[in-house]
């Protein structure tokens, strides 16, 4: 059993925060010091409220409590069960004394007790309560964090305290990054917890460069723990074939092979024993191991060399293997700290070596195909159903399905990408403890990364079968390791039939059915090249390796590697999505310790070509000679109701176009307006205002589908009636200024109009009656105006607009003084 690395051990004599003792679930042993009161936290009705009460009781800032707990557990309490490294509750409190670490990450001896025991001493809560009561665990974790704090104001003063939960700089930085970015999620038991983003939080300094001897991005705590390249025994000759635990190559240079995949594994064991295995020359090696508790990374192999990790030499030749501490049958194993450091590492490797960030090239060990007939049944199934691919690819910056919305609008011939969700996707599983000891029993309601496929469109139908994974079985099962009928998030499928909410898709040589409910669709439309078999009578063979043809070995001294088809076929009438149409057909020869064997350390390339496919649960290969490749096609879409135009058909009026209705759900549209059948340059918005030049002419709009998945089909509206003259709108009425006295002059303001007028005409009014000849902008008052009220009537005009008239308010009666 591994020793968890949780940071500096909690000393029995650690400073306690002085608060009254909680009366409930108290430890029976007495204590001479005062304890943190957990009473309010224990009675909090929600996890959100419990964080607030614990913050009040301990003095730890509530956002910091949430951020630390998120990195340790994503706020899941594991239902009273131990998590990946034996911890309990949202703070992952450990039963064992953790190893102590100093600032240089060098272990040092310390008299220590477990986190559970220390939290019990600080709060008076029993160890059992701290393990099993979520609110008790929150109070205990908060008390521990408070006891680690050495004073100071502000969130930055808590960095050392945070480090004692995670031991590594990565963990501290991740906690503070979480404070900056915020998080909100619903936990496995339905609790909504929200951490509001605070961009004012200062991040701890990032490492400026990775340590020597590691291929990691700056800022990650990586250490070199090299895998040995050694003979089986010292007495063996240099040309011995008995050596381990990897092969030398030039994968990052011109010698090849190329790097095309990153394989995600779990260790099915603890960190320390796993790292020791990678150091055993008689065992096998992979490139990296990532620790669960804090995401710490150990690098074992240089990317140029070939690890022995995938169980498939072709995949080994072309891949980097990353082991994650954990067990595939344990629902709560994979920590947020592990996800984040792993994603940061993978993003770095993918960018450096040109590996696509997609689910066909960043793959699980469970996606690696067998090598020869009968080998598929022996392949691995890690990282298993509890690895959150959706979250992982979000962290990679390459979300599954991109920014497209899941849709129920699917038709035969469509290629779809499955997006399962995770926390909201609790599929039934059985046999977790037996399939992946020492995992506990499968947890009902736990999130999963797959959806089941059925043999007919019904959830009571038998699960789909996989003749390679379970030869002779007529149906898949819910057993934890049985991937026969599991389509995992990111997988691409070709739709053959649609029946209501059910999609009939091609799977392992048969038609299988995926439930895609309209109220919670699980697929996004995508584009992919596809293949169909050339022969109407002979199915295409499916391979687990893209090896060269026999003639390529001639004269090399390298034994021919037989092309052994797998248990699968592609019959006539079936279509599968292509995940890579530019594969290298090669075989890297490596059989002797010193590379002196015939053709050793040579990457032999062939002329035969293969495509990589999505097929059943895995990635497989098919010879191009046996299939036809079809370019990604946009699906057809038709207008069912033409676009319409609404709004006033007049100069200056705003016309609005509706898109009409279409046979498929379309992501968007483009618009083009026409006047008397001629395209109006630049008129490409959903709205259009006819100008003066449009007077008397008819307008129509052409709407074109703007969706990468569908053909760019267009439809036109009916033409409008001829555009009528525009109308003015008075925003501010005319006004008269000046003193209404005989001998004085009044002046007219025309007011404010929309649109602006070109001309304005004036008519002065005396008690509402036009004054003959008074048509200027000013009016001189005479004796005729004595006692009258004077106003002005303004008429505005412009080209293509109907004249408009408005009258000012009248003055007070004209006086002589």
Predicted regions and their residues:
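Secretory targeting and sorting signals
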Residues: 1-30
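Second-shell loop/turn segments in exported
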Residues: 35-42, 50-58, 123-135, 162-164, ...
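Catalytic glycan-binding domains that act on GlcNAc-containing polysaccharides
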Residues: 36-182, 187-188
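N-terminal catalytic cores of peptidoglycan-degrading enzymes
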Residues: 39-46, 191-311, 381, 510, ...
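Basic/polar, cationic surfaces and motifs that engage anionic cell-wall
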Residues: 172-231, 331-446
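SH3/SH3-like (including bacterial SH3b) beta-barrel domains
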Residues: 465-489, 495-498, 554-564, 568-569, ...
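Boundary regions of SH3-family modules and the immediately adjacent low-complexity/disordered segments
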Residues: 507-556, 595-599, 605-635
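Ser/Thr/Pro/Gly-rich low-complexity disordered regions
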Residues: 635-817
């Amino acid at each position: 059993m591994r020793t968890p690395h949780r940071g500096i051990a909690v000393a029995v004599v650690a400073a306690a925060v002085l608060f009254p003792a909680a009366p409930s679930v108290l430890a029976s042993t007495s204590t001479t010091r005062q304890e943190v009161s957990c009473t309010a936290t224990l009675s909090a009705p929600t996890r959100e409220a419990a964080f607030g009460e614990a913050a009040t009781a301990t003095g730890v800032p509530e956002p910091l409590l949430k951020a630390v707990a998120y990195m340790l557990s994503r706020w899941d309490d594991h239902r009273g069960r131990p998590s990946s490294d034996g911890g309990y509750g949202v703070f992952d409190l450990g039963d064992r004394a953790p190893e102590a670490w100093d600032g240089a990450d060098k272990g040092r001896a310390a008299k220590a007790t477990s986190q559970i025991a220390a939290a019990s001493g600080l709060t008076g809560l029993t160890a059992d309560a701290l393990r099993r009561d979520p609110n008790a665990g929150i109070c205990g974790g908060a008390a521990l964090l408070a006891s680690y704090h050495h004073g100071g104001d502000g969130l930055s003063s808590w960095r050392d305290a945070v480090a004692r939960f995670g031991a590594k700089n990565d963990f501290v930085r991740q906690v503070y990054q979480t404070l900056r970015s915020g998080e909100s999620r619903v936990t496995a038991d339905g609790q909504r917890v929200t951490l509001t983003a605070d961009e004012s939080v200062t991040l701890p300094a990032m490492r400026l460069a990775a340590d020597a001897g590691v291929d990691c991005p700056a800022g990650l705590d990586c250490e070199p723990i090299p895998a040995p390249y050694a003979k089986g025994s010292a007495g063996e000759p240099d040309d011995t074939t008995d050596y381990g635990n990897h092969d030398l190559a030039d994968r990052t240079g011109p010698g090849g092979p190329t790097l095309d995949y990153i394989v995600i594994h779990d260790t099915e064991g603890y960190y320390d024993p796993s790292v020791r295995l990678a150091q055993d020359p008689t065992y096998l090696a992979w490139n990296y191991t990532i620790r669960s508790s804090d995401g710490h990374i150990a690098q074992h192999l240089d990317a140029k060399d070939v690890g022995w990790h995938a169980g498939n030499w072709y995949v080994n030749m072309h891949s980097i293997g990353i082991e994650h501490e954990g067990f595939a049958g344990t629902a709560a194993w994979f920590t947020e700290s592990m996800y984040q450091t792993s994603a940061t590492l993978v993003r770095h490797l993918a960018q450096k070596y040109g590996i696509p960030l997609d689910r066909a090239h960043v793959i699980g060990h469970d996606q690696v195909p067998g090598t020869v007939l009968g080998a598929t049944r022996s392949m691995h199934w890690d990282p298993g159903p509890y690895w959150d691919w959706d979250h992982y690819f979000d962290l990679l910056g390459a979300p599954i399905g991109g920014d497209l919305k899941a849709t129920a609008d699917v038709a035969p011939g469509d290629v779809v990408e499955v997006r399962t969700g995770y926390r909201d996707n609790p599929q039934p599983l059985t046999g977790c403890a037996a399939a992946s000891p020492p995992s506990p029993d499968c947890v009902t309601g736990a999130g999963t990364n797959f959806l089941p496929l059925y043999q007919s469109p019904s959830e009571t139908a038998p699960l789909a079968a996989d003749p390679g994974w379970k030869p002779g079985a007529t149906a898949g099962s819910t057993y934890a390791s049985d991937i026969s009928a599991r389509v995992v998030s990111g997988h691409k499928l070709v739709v053959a039939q649609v029946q209501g909410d059910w999609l009939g898709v091609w799977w392992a040589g048969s038609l299988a059915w995926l439930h895609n409910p309209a109220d919670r669709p699980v697929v996004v439309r995508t584009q992919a090249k596809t293949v169909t078999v050339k022969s109407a009578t002979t199915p295409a063979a499916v391979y687990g390796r893209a090896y060269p043809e026999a003639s390529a070995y001639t004269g090399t001294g390298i034994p021919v590697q037989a092309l052994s088809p797998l248990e699968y076929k592609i019959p006539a009438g079936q279509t599968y999505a292509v995940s890579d149409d530019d594969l290298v057909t090669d075989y890297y020869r490596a059989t002797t310790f010193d590379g002196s064997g015939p053709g050793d350390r040579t990457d032999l390339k062939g002329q035969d070509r293969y495509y990589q496919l999505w097929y059943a649960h895995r990635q497989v290969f098919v010879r191009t000679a046996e299939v036809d490749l079809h370019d990604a096609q946009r699906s057809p879409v038709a207008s069912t109701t033409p676009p319409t135009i609404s709004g006033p058909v007049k100069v200056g009026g705003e016309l609005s176009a509706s898109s009409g209705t279409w046979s498929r759900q379309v992501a968007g549209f483009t618009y083009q307006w026409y006047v008397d059948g001629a395209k109006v340059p630049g008129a490409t918005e959903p709205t259009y205002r006819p100008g003066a030049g449009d007077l008397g002419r008819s307008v129509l709009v052409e709407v074109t589908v703007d969706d990468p998945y569908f053909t760019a089909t267009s439809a036109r509206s009916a033409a409008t009636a001829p555009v009528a003259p525009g109308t003015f709108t008075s925003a501010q009425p005319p006004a008269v200024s000046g003193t209404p006295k005989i001998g004085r002059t009044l002046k007219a303001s025309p007011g404010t109009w929309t649109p602006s007028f070109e001309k304005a005409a004036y008519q002065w009014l005396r008690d509402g009656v036009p004054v003959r000849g008074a048509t200027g902008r000013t009016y001189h008052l005479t004796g005729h105006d004595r006692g009258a009220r004077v106003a002005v009537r303004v008429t505005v005009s412009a080209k293509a607009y109907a004249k408009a008239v408005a009258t000012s308010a009248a003055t007070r009666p004209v006086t002589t003084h």
